[in-house]
Design a protein with these regions (language model features):
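Metabolite-binding pocket within alpha/beta catalytic cores that recognizes anionic/polar moieties
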Residues: 1-109
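Non-catalytic positions within long, well-ordered alpha-helices that form the structural scaffold/packing
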Residues: 54-57, 156, 175
Length: 232
């Protein structure tokens, strides 16, 4: 495994980028929350993270996001690949088009996730026998606190199926940088008031167990995705 500590024009990324071989394919991994999960969502340097991956040769980014479920198809232990998102964050640097001399580019963001990569992920999951919900809307909130029941009720009315804290500005920045980008949403728990028991108390152990269950097929899915990329 190679370990890289790149510094980009946007500063340092959240931590080292590790590059290794998976079934003969070079794969880069970067923990967006930093070593030991030390960075809250609003303090992540999303620009530097993506720029570091880009500089090391990455052209496709598969983002892993732990989320809460809002609608019935996205209960705990579900793995999803959303096709839409709504941004509720604020105060985060959300563009690379703000430095002096930088050309302002108004990128098309009607489909926030790259369709070709999403299609490959969905096909790879099917080939690997990994259950995956195709579609859904990810609502990106500010964090690090969790949401109120009223906020989740509003998000449901807005059309959100999932809620997380790191989906934006990451997806928008990836589009500006020309990176293919898709999300694998790992449902850890019901969002506030969204489950069948609105008074349910979620424990840390519940969350850890649910994440482990939803993530169990990821190695097979990713291996299948890499095999498809080679075939293409």
């Amino acid at each position: 495994v190679e370990t890289h500590q790149p510094v980009t024009r946007y500063g340092a990324p959240s931590g080292p980028v590790r590059i290794g071989l998976l079934d003969g394919h070079r794969v880069a991994f970067l923990a967006r929350h930093g070593e030991g999960h030390s960075l809250p969502p609003h303090q992540i340097n999303y620009r530097a993270n993506l720029a570091a991956l880009h500089a090391l040769g990455a052209g496709r980014v598969l983002a892993l996001n732990t989320v809460g479920g809002i609608t019935a198809d996205f209960g705990p232990r579900v793995l999803g690949c959303p096709d839409q998102l709504i941004d509720y964050t604020w105060g985060r640097i959300s563009t690379i088009c703000e430095e002096p001399g930088t050309e302002v580019v108004h990128v098309d963001f009607g489909e926030p996730y790259t369709r070709s990569l999403r299609n490959d992920v969905i096909a790879a999951a099917a080939a690997a026998g990994v259950a995956l919900v195709d579609g859904g809307c990810y609502g990106a909130t500010q964090g690090p606190r969790l949401e109120t029941r009223a906020e989740i009720a509003r998000m449901r009315r807005d059309g959100c199926d999932l809620v997380g804290m790191t989906g934006m500005p990451e997806a928008g920045l990836a589009r500006e940088m020309g990176l293919d980008y898709a999300c694998l949403a790992i449902v850890a728990n019901w969002a506030a008031g969204a489950g069948p028991d609105p008074d349910e108390v979620i424990t840390l152990q519940d969350v850890l167990d649910n994440v482990a269950a939803a993530s169990s097929g990821l190695p097979r899915l990713i291996a299948s995705l890499l095999a498809r990329q080679t075939a293409e």
